[in-house]
């Protein structure tokens, strides 16, 4: 059986850890002047993917 292909876009965005799948929050790149300090602070830490989306990401990352 041939090797399964990794979805390269997903590989750059998600990282599998013991606690789940880690990802970075969106809307934190540019044009941040209109965002409040509180909002920018809340987007700062990495987040764990919700359980309902884990299966789709695992399918894209067969060797993670």
Swiss-Prot record:
Cross-referenced InterPro entries: Ribosomal_bL35, Ribosomal_bL35-like, Ribosomal_bL35_CS, Ribosomal_bL35_sf
GO molecular function (one): structural constituent of ribosome
Gene3D superfamilies: 4.10.410.60
GO cellular component: cytosolic large ribosomal subunit
Protein keywords: Ribonucleoprotein, Ribosomal protein
Pfam families assigned: Ribosomal_L35p
PROSITE patterns attached to this UniProt entry: RIBOSOMAL_L35
SUPFAM superfamilies: L35p-like (SSF143034)
Record GO biological process: translation
Domain of life of the organism encoding this protein: Bacteria
Protein family per UniProt: Belongs to the bacterial ribosomal protein bL35 family.
PANTHER family (UniProt xref): 54S RIBOSOMAL PROTEIN BL35M, LARGE RIBOSOMAL SUBUNIT PROTEIN BL35M
Protein's name in the database: Large ribosomal subunit protein bL35
Organism: Vibrio parahaemolyticus serotype O3:K6 (strain RIMD 2210633)
Gene assigned in the entry: rpmI
